[in-house]
Regions:
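Extreme N-terminal, non-catalytic leader segments
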Residues: 3-7, 141-188
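Gly-rich Lys/Arg/Thr-decorated short loops/hinges at beta-loop-alpha junctions or inter-strand turns
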Residues: 14-21, 35-46, 67-71, 101, ...
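Nucleotide-state-sensitive switch-loop elements of NTP-binding domains
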Residues: 172-186, 197, 202, 206-276
Length: 276
């Protein structure tokens, strides 16, 4: 039975806004555990970009960099965890991505599939933490989430934003004045509707047709906004899970939380549109 001590029930209070990407690894349909973890992350105040199951390293890294997340959590029960997590670290730390990816904390779990010697091997390689069944018994679910949040509780902003993702982060944090950004002339289309109306599916279909019709000649940006929970400050940013046509150099996607109760848009949306 899981030992939930008093300390493990206390929710970590972060000093900064923390963003996490969560997913189950490639060829892996076991998403029950990662769904539990992303729900607790959200309930603990994190903004969670959930990708769902069967996600490649390329897809995960692309999401982490475009979303400018501090952490990524992946569950892997399909037996290929050594190769998967090492490749994930390699891509994040590659010269191409080093400016944004070097700081990203990588977390994983796979129950009894990942044995103790492999846990050590992966953590020695650069994974921040692989949580074992013994960790779950000792720390409890909230205890593991608290550990993840504490390791990712650092200022996500950089002094001189070099990427679009970093620019949007600076806009969200209010340290960059949107008036200093010269608006581009790209046409802007807004899609709105109630939850479950099909906004993400429609957007994905539009992107797919633009790419097919124009032969990937266009550069396309998608800015997706979801509400922040007033009580916890967390948010589930789940539109990426419906996007199948965004994978490629010409498409950028960023998920934003409203961060303000009662608002339907993020305060950074105007600056983000101008920055593109």
């Amino acid at each position: 039975m899981t030992d939930l001590s008093d300390s493990s029930k206390l929710v970590y209070k972060a000093k900064h806004k923390i963003r996490f990407v969560t997913a189950a690894s490639l060829f892996d349909g076991h998403d029950a555990s990662i769904n539990i973890m992303r729900r607790i992350l959200q309930a603990s105040g994190a903004e969670v970009i959930h990708l769902g199951h069967n996600r490649s390293v390329d897809e995960v890294v692309s999401a982490v960099l475009q979303e400018d997340a501090q952490g990524v959590a992946v569950s892997s029960y399909q037996g290929g965890h050594i190769e998967y997590f090492k490749y994930l670290i390699d891509l994040l730390r590659s010269p191409k991505n080093e400016a944004a990816g070097a700081r990203v904390q990588v977390f994983g779990g796979g129950g009894g599939v990942v044995v103790a010697s492999e846990v050590k091997e992966l953590q020695d390689y650069g994974v921040a933490r692989i949580y074992s069944p013994e960790d779950g018994q000792r720390m409890g679910l909230q205890g593991m989430i608290n550990d993840m949040l504490a390791r990712c509780d650092f200022d996500p902003a950089v002094k001189e934003p070099k990427t679009l993702a970093q620019t949007i982060t600076a806009l969200e944090l209010g340290i960059l004045d949107p008036k200093t950004i010269k608006p581009k002339s790209a046409p802007v289309l807004g899609v709105t509707g109630t939850g479950g109306a099909g906004k993400s599916s429609l957007t994905d279909e539009l992107v797919r047709r633009f790419r097919l019709d124009q032969g990937d000649a266009l550069k396309i940006a998608i800015l997706s906004v979801d509400p922040t929970r007033r009580k916890t400050g967390g948010a589930l940013l789940g539109d990426r899970i419906r996007m199948n046509a965004i994978h490629g150099d010409g498409v950028f996607m960023r998920s934003l939380a409203t961060r303000e109760g009662g608002s339907g848009l993020s305060g950074a949306i105007g600056g983000a549109v101008a920055a593109w």
